[in-house]
Amino acid sequence: MAKTIAFDEEARRGLERGLNALADAVKVTLGPKGRNVVLEKKWGAPTITNDGVSIAKEIELEDPYEKIGAELVKEVAKKTDDVAGDGTTTATVLAQALVREGLRNMAAGANPLGLKRGIEKAVEAVTEHLLKEAKEVETKEQIAATAGISAGDPAIGELIAEAMDKVGKEGVITVEESNTFGLQLELTEGMRFDKGFISGYFATDAERQEAVLEDAYILLVSSKISTVKDLLPLLEKVIQSGKPLAIIAEDVEGEALSTLIVNKIRGTFKSVAIKAPGFGDRRKAMLQDMAILTGGQVISEEVGLSLETAGLELLGQARQVVVTKDETTIVDGAGSKEQIEGRVSQIRAEIESSDSDYDREKLQERLAKLAGGVAVIKAGAATEVELKERKHRIEDAVRNAKAAVEEGIVAGGGAALAQSGKVFETLNLEGDEATGANIVKVALDAPVKQIAINAGLEPGVVAEKVRNSPAGTGLNAATGVYEDLLAAGINDPVKVTRSALQNASSIAALFLTTEAVVADKPEKAGAPVDPTGGMGGMDF
């Protein structure tokens, strides 16, 4: 495909137009009085959202240079969302301000590499300042305030705080769509996975269609069980112990399954057969998690263990196993605390080293099942459009709350960034580096100005007042009052604030040092095809 090349000012201005087109669409959502954006979908109802990254992903521009400019800012929003789960609009607003100021200074003759070094040093200083100023999240109320601001709804914040209180900071909080109106919270203690019993005959409560095994043995097998002779020696030992047995295997079929069902119906022996969750390596890992949680071992040929020779010492144990047709919950496994902690550390290390969002999410789920618990927030709404928007807001707020617990909180409303300008007094920079640092100083006011604009206030006046207020004092845009924002429960996770600044400055610095852009040349539209195939004189 033919390429088109632009140089110097033309290249940078083309990129800036794309950046501005995207940023202008995103920044209207910032703050408590920010508006929503409607996104058209090719199929189904349109989506209404105030999430910066969702809006950014939908924007495709026609001009090749503008398209690249927009893609660069999309990267800022996406990276901030990946790291912190929120702050995508703030990151976009900061990137726009940094690029605008940077290009203005370059037009006045500043050297782009000097500006880049100055921007990097200034951002490093501001990041250190923010981390130092951050307050640890110690109370349920602080989590509720942080999540409530992210979701724009205090009720959602309180529900998330309650969920985190119950499952701990390592626990998984999932959001599901509900058929009923409003919000509900469901909590699960122990390990739950999405596989139920293989046959309904295993149910101990026919009305509720669930099997409940108290003080049960748990047999974990990595392969299929089909012949009863493999299982018989172990079954006899379990029957003698008088305890029920839960079998979790790749599958249980044939005469092995028939024998278990017949014994269950006759009341000879209480058992339940369950398919292991997941596939391939993930299934092996989850079985190993269960083994560590219950104090048993996975019977697998890979480690030289077989069913025929297995004894009771290889079985896991749990206070209770609850199985329905769709899911299984293991409560209070008998595994040793040290082994569980070791496994948790191992999974945490895998999360750190993984570069796949999907893998990270699955590892996080495994971690929660071992270390904390699972909370499910069920959200309902009057229409499908509202339901999607609400679910998205809750998911963002959950990630926001987790970020707050991780690194602490700073004053919200853009105040923490605007007041970080004081660190520039300690930076001894000269020439273009000092100019680069000043670009950052000016850009730090951009979020508070945009919040003021969206609230119908004068941005310059608000920014000036916030900048010169005591640390932590700023504008509560919802009420129009200047107050101690942390005391008023208006806070942002420092992880979100610093990620927004770091990612915005990274792209802005690259933007300013760009001297040429190579893009695909737009193809000329071909002549319309004659539907008659060139055959004239056709009458209908």
From Swiss-Prot:
Q: Which GO terms describe its cellular component?
A: cytoplasm
**Top-level taxonomic group:** Bacteria
A UniProt-annotated Pfam family: Cpn60_TCP1
| Taxonomic classification | Bacteria, Bacillati, Actinomycetota, Actinomycetes, Mycobacteriales
| Key words of the record | ATP-binding, Chaperone, Cytoplasm, Isomerase, Nucleotide-binding
**Biological process GO annotation list?**
protein refolding
Q: PANTHER family per the record?
A: 60 KDA HEAT SHOCK PROTEIN, MITOCHONDRIAL
| Annotated family | Belongs to the chaperonin (HSP60) family.
Q: What is this protein called?
A: Chaperonin GroEL
Top enzyme category: isomerase
Binding residues annotated for ATP, in chain numbering: 29-32, 86-90, 413, 476-478, 492
Subunit relationships: Forms a cylinder of 14 subunits composed of two heptameric rings stacked back-to-back. Interacts with the co-chaperonin GroES.
According to UniProt, the reaction catalysed is: ATP + H2O + a folded polypeptide = ADP + phosphate + an unfolded polypeptide
Q: What does this protein do?
A: Together with its co-chaperonin GroES, plays an essential role in assisting protein folding. The GroEL-GroES system forms a nano-cage that allows encapsulation of the non-native substrate proteins and provides a physical environment optimized to promote and accelerate protein folding.
